Amino acid sequence: TGKGHSFGAKISHTLPMTGAWWHQLSLGVSFNDRSEEVGMVDQKAQTVPLKYAPVTFAYSGFRQGERHLVSSGVSLVFGTRSLFGYGSDAAAFDWARYKADPSFFVLKADVGDTLTFGTGMQLASRISVQHTDRPLTSGEQFAAGGMYTVRGYRSAEAIGDIGAQGSVELRTRAFSLPGVQDWRIYTYFDGAWLKLKEPLPEQEDEFKLGSVGLGTSLRMFDTLNVRLDYGYPLTDGPTTTQGAHRLHFSIGAGF
């Protein structure tokens, strides 16, 4: 694990519409400066400074039909050994993560669909995957757990180099009250699979998370977005036990 900061730049180009599809391509670079904490069993953790500047090429697509709202995305992330002289050497990467290398490659993809029935009920589904050719440092790994991935578990409880995560959510029609808009109640199933490449002997290298639960979301006064989820884990996680109960809550403002 580690902490740090980053800054970057991105250029985007919107492609011509293909039927009802909206498309966009983007190219970006991020300059990351992190302090990775490396710990061994029965040893004090050490901090490894790590700098790297990955280049990301991405595609995103969006389609809004009469009943379906579909989104998709694919991104390719290329690690660079040194970009304009910025970047740590291979030894620093190997120390931060066994067999990690600054010249890494990551493929990410996601797709989501929201189907609205004639009654106003909705069935929402999404899946995201990540694949790589080698072990990654913590900033590039695939994480699962928490309100926006697998509810019922702690945020980013499980981490892997490759993985897949999916969710299916059945929502009621939207209700409206004075001062309340788009209030829905839903039930869901979340799941994820993650795996480490080249794990150390003492490391657990594979994680399977799954949960079911109930939740509600609403918008108040056209400004506040409120969401509350209850999650029931179906499997043990790294720190969460099967059958534990967890509530997730978020509130945000949009103007």
Residue ranges and their predicted role:
Residues 1-138, 195:
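Transmembrane beta-strand segments of outer-membrane beta-barrel domains in Gram-negative
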Residues 92-255:
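C-terminal transmembrane beta-barrel domains of outer membrane proteins
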